[in-house]
Structure formats: C-alpha cells, structure tokens
C-alpha cells in the first residue's frame, strides 16, 4: 500500500461567537464595512482554551472517524503560529493528551500554509519511515496574538482547529503537492517573539508580540500565489479542472479568492468558502473547511480536490488529492 490517504477529518471551534457588531464596540468599524472588505460576519474566539486544547479536541474527532486508536499513531505534526509555549511543542502536548506514546512529534511554523505543508511533510515521513498512520493538525488561538485596537487586523482573525488522520491505502490519496516560499517578503506579515535584552546585547530591541500585516502587499502576493500553486500542482497529473470537484482555499479574505478565481479563469463556485462564519484561523482554515464539507456530505469517495494556502513567511502551497 504505497498511497497516503486522509482517513478521517475533524475540527473544533470555541463556543464564543464574536460578531462584527461586537468588534465595532471597541474599534471604529461596522458590520457593513467589514463585510464589504472581507466577506466576514463573525468568528469564534477562545475564552481560555489554548492551542493544545483545541488541537486535541479536533484530533479526537478525526481519530474516531478514521477508526484509529491514538495509541497506534506513529507521527503527530501540528501546524501553528500560536503555540501554548515555545517548548514543549503543541504536538508533544497533544501526544500527552491523547496518550499517543508511540508517535514522533513536532510543530511546523508556516502560518496559514501550515496544514498543507504538514500534509506533504507527513506523507514524506510516512513513506521514508514506513509509518502506517499519522495525525496532522492545523490549530490557532490567534486572539492571544491579535492587537484588538488595530482595526486592520482584529476584524480578520479567529480561533479554531482542524485535524486529519492519514493512513496507507491502496486507493489514491495525496497525488501531488507544491510548496514554495518568498522570504524576501516576510516583513509583510509578522508576529514578534521575545525582546532582545541581555547583558551582552548592544541595544535593547523590544518585540511587537501581536500580528502586524501589510494588507495590500499580502493581497497582491496571495492572488499570484494561488494562481501559481494551483497551476503547478495540476501539471503532469492528467487531471483537468473539469475533474476537480472543489478547490479549498485558505479563508483569508473574500476579495483575494474572487481575484484568484478570475486569474485562474474559474467560477467562484469551484471554491469552497466558509470565512463568513469562521474568519481567518490561519493554519486551521483549510482543515476546518474540509471538516465542514465532510459533515455536509459534499465529499464522496473518489472526489478530486485541491487544497491551496498562502501566509506568513511568506509561504504558499497546494495539494491535489483524491478523497
């Protein structure tokens, strides 16, 4: 069995719903202004659950649907830019929560591209290490790194987690991936980490520990990145756009997806969107959307879909897979 397939999908969203009207109570904005510029109406916000907590809840659902016991997991990868702490990794915390004692564990920091990067990373390790199964999680508690006085960013982000269990299978699964980055544009989207203030530093450097984003630069990059990644992941596969049931994009902003669809000369109906209710949950957007599609009965065995994402780094990626 040389193919790697998604065997189970799961997601978890905090219960607190924060509407645009609620945000307008503490920054100068309105529901109309936010919807017009982003397509978003509400997002979920954690009231205390950390990244490992929501990751574990999404993972348990994915494992249940895959019919795999956590004790049999051989690999756990968590994609996040909002970990509980620097060390241990969120993946190690999830391993402990699940009692998945056999699993190798690590986090990847690829921002909004993280889940797509994680799938291909897990596939490669499963092939090279002969693992039978793996867990890939995209999870964020972005509310703790959001500047709630910055109207340009606080309207965008939400909290949530999505998880996929991968297993070896005779049937096709992950067909091809395309991973890229442009580090020269990295300053367009940043979150500071720690202050540089030691007895040996020449000057004190204070980190801005909240999201700082150049929205215009990200929009230009994102439209081009989606076009390139989707086009490249289709090359040499004998798969046409007519064969693709859905493209599942990172849910960053409706305008980005609209412009990308136009550039690809595809109908917007080909793109699955749920940002209106969930907002931008960074590495979690793609698996949360996949989980929603699964629960709505939109994904059938043999369906071909493309996952495409872009984000901090700057990074971008796409995966062509068969459900």
Swiss-Prot record:
Source domain of life: Bacteria
Key words, A-Z: Acyltransferase, Cytoplasm, Fatty acid biosynthesis, Fatty acid metabolism, Lipid biosynthesis, Lipid metabolism, Multifunctional enzyme, Transferase
Localisation: Cytoplasm
GO molecular function: 3-oxoacyl-[acyl-carrier-protein] synthase activity; beta-ketoacyl-acyl-carrier-protein synthase III activity
EC number(s) given by UniProt: 2.3.1.180
Enzyme class: transferase
GO cellular component: cytoplasm
Biochemical pathway: Lipid metabolism; fatty acid biosynthesis
PANTHER family found in the cross-reference section: 3-OXOACYL-[ACYL-CARRIER-PROTEIN] SYNTHASE 3 (PTHR34069), BETA-KETOACYL-[ACYL-CARRIER-PROTEIN] SYNTHASE III (PTHR34069:SF2)
Family according to the record: Belongs to the thiolase-like superfamily. FabH family.
Subunit structure and binding partners: Homodimer.
UniProt-listed NCBIfam families: fabH, PRK09352.1
Function: Catalyzes the condensation reaction of fatty acid synthesis by the addition to an acyl acceptor of two carbons from malonyl-ACP. Catalyzes the first condensation reaction which initiates fatty acid synthesis and may therefore play a role in governing the total rate of fatty acid production. Possesses both acetoacetyl-ACP synthase and acetyl transacylase activities. Its substrate specificity determines the biosynthesis of branched-chain and/or straight-chain of fatty acids.
Name of the molecule in the record: Beta-ketoacyl-[acyl-carrier-protein] synthase III
Gene: fabH
